[in-house]
């Protein structure tokens, strides 16, 4: 005789979903940093990954206030929609925003402006802000699926007194045990989203109804093509004489400096539609739409060795 009774998990064997496991891991990392370090900061650009990270950090300490500030390294070449969302989310969360300006470093002669993109020189601004504010840990939204240099970086990534990363001297990380030991002047970069994928990020955004800048969804925009990428026409990004401008329905998979961030043609106007597109994507968002990663095969690793995000 057969039975139609479905046997569920035994009492005490409650199972978390994949997304909730990732959430729990990230919250554990954030709380670990808050307990272990004196002056942490959350790097916050207003992009999807940093917004998810802020959402997780607020959740980690609710109903209390976030016990550390957020910081944006501002190149001055930003998408207006992203800056507006950044300011609104920070105000709604009631957290302190530190803005580290690349323009200030250019004006002070600490760096020489690079053309067309300021992306390479923002490392100087980042390290200056960490040093001046005496931050000993900085949360970043990097994920291992984005790029090969990030794929081999630890959750707790040690930086020396010059802010440099040495991939050959990384510390072992067993299970959920993290080594935050450092001397004065050194700091740790912390990546709570290391084990997330782009698909996970969008699934979590949908599940938690996380608000994003409008440019992550399909919209009409004037663009031009350069090096196989669609770039947006912007006051800081103008086409060359041989680059015709046309209007297309596009969205951005990742958000960074206007001068090195491309968009993709898309009709996805909702989170569900973006998730469906992401599920069949064969290139990561950085591989598909970030010109700064195409400088060389080791472009990201070279920048990270110098102190980049």
Swiss-Prot record:
Top-tier EC class: transferase
InterPro entries tied to this protein: PAPS_reduct_dom (IPR002500), Rossmann-like_a/b/a_fold (IPR014729), SO4_adenylTrfase_ssu (IPR011784), Sulfate_adenylyltrnsfr_sub2 (IPR050128)
UniProt keyword Nucleotide-binding present: yes
EC numbers for this chain: 2.7.7.4
Membrane spanning stretches: none
A GO CC term attached to the entry: cytosol
Known partners and oligomeric status: Heterodimer composed of CysD, the smaller subunit, and CysNC.
Family label: Belongs to the PAPS reductase family. CysD subfamily.
Miscellaneous section: Was identified as a high-confidence drug target.
Function: With CysN forms the ATP sulfurylase (ATPS) that catalyzes the adenylation of sulfate producing adenosine 5'-phosphosulfate (APS) and diphosphate, the first enzymatic step in sulfur assimilation pathway. APS synthesis involves the formation of a high-energy phosphoric-sulfuric acid anhydride bond driven by GTP hydrolysis by CysN coupled to ATP hydrolysis by CysD.
Name under which the protein is recorded: Sulfate adenylyltransferase subunit 2
Protein source organism: Mycobacterium tuberculosis (strain ATCC 25618 / H37Rv)
Organism taxonomic ancestry: Bacteria, Bacillati, Actinomycetota, Actinomycetes, Mycobacteriales
């Amino acid at each position: 005789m057969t039975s139609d009774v479905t046997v569920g998990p035994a009492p005490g064997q409650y199972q978390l979903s994949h997304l909730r496991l990732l959430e729990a891991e990230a919250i554990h990392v954030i709380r670990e940093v808050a307990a272990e370090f004196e002056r942490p900061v959350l790097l916050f650009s207003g992009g999807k990954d940093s917004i998810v990270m802020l959402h997780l950090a607020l959740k980690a300490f609710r109903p209390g206030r976030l016990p550390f500030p957020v910081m944006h390294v501002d190149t001055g070449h930003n998408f207006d929609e992203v800056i507006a969302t950044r300011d609104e989310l920070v105000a709604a969360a009631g957290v302190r925003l530190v803005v580290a300006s690349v323009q200030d470093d250019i004006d002070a002669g600490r760096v020489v402006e690079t053309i067309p993109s300021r992306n390479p020189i923002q490392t100087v601004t980042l390290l200056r802000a960490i040093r001046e504010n005496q931050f000993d840990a900085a949360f970043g939204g990097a994920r291992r699926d984005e790029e090969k240099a990030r794929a081999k970086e630890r959750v707790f990534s040690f930086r020396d007194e010059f802010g440099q990363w040495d991939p050959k001297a990384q510390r072992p990380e067993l299970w959920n045990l993290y080594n935050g030991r450092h001397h004065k002047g050194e700091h740790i970069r912390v990546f709570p989203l290391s084990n997330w994928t782009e698909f996970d990020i969008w699934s979590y955004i949908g599940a938690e109804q996380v608000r994003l800048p409008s440019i992550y969804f399909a919209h009409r925009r004037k663009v031009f093509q350069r090096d196989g990428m669609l770039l947006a026409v912007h006051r800081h990004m103008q086409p060359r004489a041989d680059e015709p401008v046309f209007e297309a329905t596009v969205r951005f998979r990742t958000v960074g400096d206007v001068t090195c961030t491309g968009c993709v043609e898309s009709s996805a106007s909702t989170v569900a539609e973006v998730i469906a597109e992401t599920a069949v994507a064969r290139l990561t968002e950085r591989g598909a739409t970030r010109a700064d990663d195409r400088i060389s095969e080791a472009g990201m690793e070279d920048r990270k060795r110098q102190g980049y995000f």
